[in-house]
C-alpha cells in the first residue's frame, strides 16, 4: 500500500510541477506586450529550473514518461481538426510545401553556422597542421 501511494505521489508531483510551469508561462505571456505562446515560456521556465538544478529531474520524470508514451495519441485530435480545413490545404498545397522546404533549409544553415561558431575548429590529437 505504501509503495502504491508513493507511486501516486510521484506522478501527482510531476504533473503538478509541469502544470505549474505551464500556467506560470501563460501568466507571464499575458503580461508581455509581444505575443509569445505561454506554453513556450512555460517550457523555458521548466528548462531553467532543471538546468539550474533548482528542480530535481527525478521529480518530473514520471510525468514526462507518461506524456511521451502517449504522445501519438495526443496528436490525433489535432490531426482531425486540421482535416476540417482540407479544401484550404488543398488550395494552398504548393505554398505550404515551398515554405516548409525553405524553412527547413534555413534551419539547417543556421544550426550548421551556429555549431561551427560555437565549436570552432578542433585539432585532432597526434595530427600535425597543414604543412606545404
UniProtKB/Swiss-Prot annotation:
The keyword Transmembrane helix applies. GO terms for cellular component: plasma membrane. Keywords: Cell inner membrane, Cell membrane, Membrane, Transmembrane, Transmembrane helix. The keyword Transmembrane helix applies. This is UPF0299 membrane protein Ent638_2744. The chain crosses the membrane at residues 8-28, 31-51, 63-83, 93-113. It is a multi-pass membrane protein. Pfam families: LrgA. It is found in: Cell inner membrane.
Amino acid at each position: 500500500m505504501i509503495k502504491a501511494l508513493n507511486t501516486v505521489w510521484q506522478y501527482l508531483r510531476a504533473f503538478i510541477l509541469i502544470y505549474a510551469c505551464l500556467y506560470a508561462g501563460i501568466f507571464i505571456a499575458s503580461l508581455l506586450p509581444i505575443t509569445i505562446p505561454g506554453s513556450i515560456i512555460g517550457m523555458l521556465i521548466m528548462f531553467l529550473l532543471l538546468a539550474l538544478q533548482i528542480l530535481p529531474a527525478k521529480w518530473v520524470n514520471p510525468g514526462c514518461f507518461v506524456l511521451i508514451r502517449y504522445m501519438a495519441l495526443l496528436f490525433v485530435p489535432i490531426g482531425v481538426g486540421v482535416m476540417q480545413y482540407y479544401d484550404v490545404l488543398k488550395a494552398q498545397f504548393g505554398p505550404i510545401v515551398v515554405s516548409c522546404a525553405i524553412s527547413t533549409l534555413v534551419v539547417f544553415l543556421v544550426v550548421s553556422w551556429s555549431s561551427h561558431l560555437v565549436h570552432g575548429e578542433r585539432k585532432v590529437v597526434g595530427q600535425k597542421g597543414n604543412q606545404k
